[in-house]
Amino acid sequence: MSGLARLQRLQKFGFLMVSASANRPIQRYQCSRTEKPQKRTSANALLNHLIFKIKSTGPITVSEYMREVLTNPVKGYYMHNDMLGEHGDFVTSPEISQIFGELLGVWCISEWVSAGKPKAIQLVELGPGRGTLTDDLLRVFSNFGRLLDSCDISVHLVEVSPKLSDIQAQRLTGKSIEVELDSNSPVYKNGITKTGRPVCWYQDIQDVPNGYSFYIAHEFFDALPIHKLQKIKDGWREMLIDIDPKLPDKLRFVLGSNMSLVAKTFVQDDEPRDHVEVCPSAAVIIQKLAQQINSYGGAALIADYGHMGEKTDTFRGFRAHQLHDVLTDPGTADLTADVDFNFMRRMVGEAASCLGPVTQHVFLKNMGIDIRLKVLLEKSNDVTVQKQLIHGYNVLMNPDQMGQRFKFFSVVPHSRLKNTLKTKMPPVAGFSTLLMT
């Protein structure tokens, strides 16, 4: 049976059951261009730190600014905040509907079966948020118990935020987990999930063990630090962040005086745009994933804001679900930039094969979201749950909300796309049309 036919049967016969998470609160995705002023603490310690740093060493790159604002150990946005959900600054697809995580779980199982059912799976999520997506994936794996009984499944979470790792541990294991202080171990937390799977936390993707792995990165790459580059007559200059001379407690963008080394490394000679955003961290990570996947098997599934190398200025901030000036009140808003999937493809190079990007609407449609929604609606007699399911579906699929803005991209081994006379691999689910028979 082909991967798509197998996927269709799984959706049609409802092997994935409705969970209590169907009652999770639904939040409407917003992308407004205006922001109502909010009261925040006037003593912005992070701003003072940045001003002192600039006075001491000169203007800083946008990449350095993002790194400080998001992951500064004392005042970084990700380090001490629960920024997700109704009372946070943004909402993600796994928080909107259980169907999203279920379909990604089915995708993993479909790829595992296509690979010949390896004896072990490492489920690796980069930037797991509240742990909602990993929780949904593990529930799907549990519902396929007979198929996966002989498979050794472990969970590996790459998370730099102490606050979020606490939330993830509570969700996945049902209890708090103390941080380990063993300097010889890359694992800083470990436990057993509610479904009986070992789970470990790491600060860096480089520390995750080798092995057949599914790497899930949902809204991860868009938060990595970028460099903003501007083309002038004699080459590329880097956009920097400096202190506004007229307002000493404010920051502003300025153009660097020297040619950009980042541009020499990453910008192609035939680049048609006059302004680009480059993410060296994304290059390092995607190359690492490609090498691991081609050596040990598995796949990477990336879902994020993104484009194919045509956009220019996408750097923006979000606070309380509204757009927020990136240089105002640093540390109180999320900072993000669209993922350049053309750049990601170039960075993978010949190390592995790439699929996509395709829009979230197309990917979920190909994964059988309509079939899955129908099954869930038929299994529930609760009108409130039915309304939540329909609302969540609309937010995920509507082109004006998440359906068009989010893209799916995958990295797979070269062998996954090779067909021989003896072996014909099924298409990779989600990136090929689901055939209805």
Swiss-Prot record:
Subcellular location: Mitochondrion
SUPFAM superfamilies: S-adenosyl-L-methionine-dependent methyltransferases
GO molecular function terms noted in the UniProt entry: protein-arginine omega-N symmetric methyltransferase activity
InterPro entries: NDUFAF7 (IPR003788), NDUFAF7_sf (IPR038375), SAM-dependent_MTases_sf (IPR029063)
Main location: mitochondrion
Transit peptide region: 1-42
Record's keyword terms, sorted: Methyltransferase, Mitochondrion, Transferase, Transit peptide
Record EC number: 2.1.1.320
Domain of life of the organism encoding this protein: Eukaryota
Pfam family, one: Methyltransf_28
GO biological-process terms attached to the record: mitochondrial respiratory chain complex I assembly; peptidyl-arginine methylation, to symmetrical-dimethyl arginine
Record GO cellular component, one term: mitochondrion
Main enzyme class: transferase
Catalyzed chemical reaction(s): L-arginyl-[protein] + 2 S-adenosyl-L-methionine = N(omega),N(omega)'-dimethyl-L-arginyl-[protein] + 2 S-adenosyl-L-homocysteine + 2 H(+)
Function: Arginine methyltransferase involved in the assembly or stability of mitochondrial NADH:ubiquinone oxidoreductase complex (complex I). Acts by mediating symmetric dimethylation of 'Arg-118' of ndufs2 after it assembles into the complex I, stabilizing the early intermediate complex.
Similarity annotation: Belongs to the NDUFAF7 family.
Name of the protein described by the UniProt record: Protein arginine methyltransferase NDUFAF7, mitochondrial
Organism in which the protein naturally occurs: Xenopus laevis
Phylogenetic classification of the source organism: Eukaryota, Metazoa, Chordata, Craniata, Vertebrata
